[in-house]
């Protein structure tokens, strides 16, 4: 996909983001939302952005770990960081393009074939979802109405892991794929995709990266907690418990519905749950949602667009890197 098409999709998402703002403002009364934004203690915003940044840094650590797991070597750390953070700039694009932009840039900068790196976004989303389930587990016991979303994630994740780790079944499917006339030419890429999936979803990577996701997304829960404090909500363990349920529940719901960047679904979830569990007014809940979504979503988009601009300059100043053979850089799957 060309950068022009990416810009077009991003523009669509910016329009959707503006519509979400208008929708929340209409729901809560525009003048009340403006007043609420004025009353927010903006000195807390750097803490919100700092906590979100820690989440991004830990997720970059996960990206680096996964690159090593599938056997990527010799990729400079600076280029790897630019590649990862550039993906943040496209998380709000339709079709989840941002999830795969990293793999495309990895191919352009390093020559790693897409079939080798494509399982990384899958593993990232799986471990992120499992981490969110762990974060929301305590709150789920207390506020059990949202348990269906959590069950779907756990069951779906378990099915994906079992499918990837069941080598006889996978090999049977690959053999059948080779016999199909229209798709047989992709058999080699499918095998490379499976080899990476097998390595990434092994017990140690799966467990370690899920634990890392608990910590990284925990920083976003803390960011929401700080936003609530900035709105005048009394802090404490009870508020932190409720925040640790609201953010994971809203994030998981938006992930399951596959909306770009969770637009609309996440905002609706955070606003509604804040009213129900925290007793906030419509306007305060809407203001809190707008601020935390700026800090945890749109801030990342801004960082990502800067990184994408730097990557574009980097690519413009060098010769194309030949794509490596898919089987030549494989991970150990023994």
Feature annotation, model-predicted:
Residues 77-80, 98-100, 110-123, 280-291:
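Membrane-interface alpha-helices at helix entry/exit sites of multi-pass transporters
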Residues 101-105, 118-121, 131-132, 212, ...:
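Hydrophobic alpha-helical membrane segments of integral membrane proteins
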